């Protein structure tokens, strides 16, 4: 979980947009599930 949070904050820069951040987290989680 820490890796996902650390990845989305600096790279995506969505720290100030919780809604989009949640969507990105969901996409990353689904991607990991597919792998």
UniProtKB/Swiss-Prot annotation:
Q: Which GO terms describe its molecular function?
A: toxin activity
Tissue and organ distribution: Expressed in basidiocarps.
Tell me the residues linked by 2'-cysteinyl-6'-hydroxytryptophan sulfoxide (Trp-Cys): 12-16
Instruction: Give a short account of its post-translational modification.
Output: Processed by the macrocyclase-peptidase enzyme POPB to yield a toxic cyclic octapeptide. POPB first removes 10 residues from the N-terminus. Conformational trapping of the remaining peptide forces the enzyme to release this intermediate rather than proceed to macrocyclization. The enzyme rebinds the remaining peptide in a different conformation and catalyzes macrocyclization of the N-terminal 8 residues.
Q: Which domain of life is it from?
A: Eukaryota
What else is on record for this protein? The typical symptoms of amatoxin poisoning are gastro-intestinal distress beginning 6-12 hours after ingestion, a remission phase lasting 12-24 hours, and progressive loss of liver function culminating in death within 3-5 days. One of the few effective treatments is liver transplantation.
Role: Toxin belonging to the bicyclic octapeptides amatoxins that acts by binding non-competitively to RNA polymerase II and greatly slowing the elongation of transcripts from target promoters.
Name of the protein in question: Beta-amanitin proprotein
């Amino acid at each position: 979980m820490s890796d996902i949070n650390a990845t989305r904050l600096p790279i995506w820069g969505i720290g100030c947009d919780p809604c989009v951040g949640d969507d990105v987290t969901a996409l990353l989680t689904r991607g990991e599930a597919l792998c």
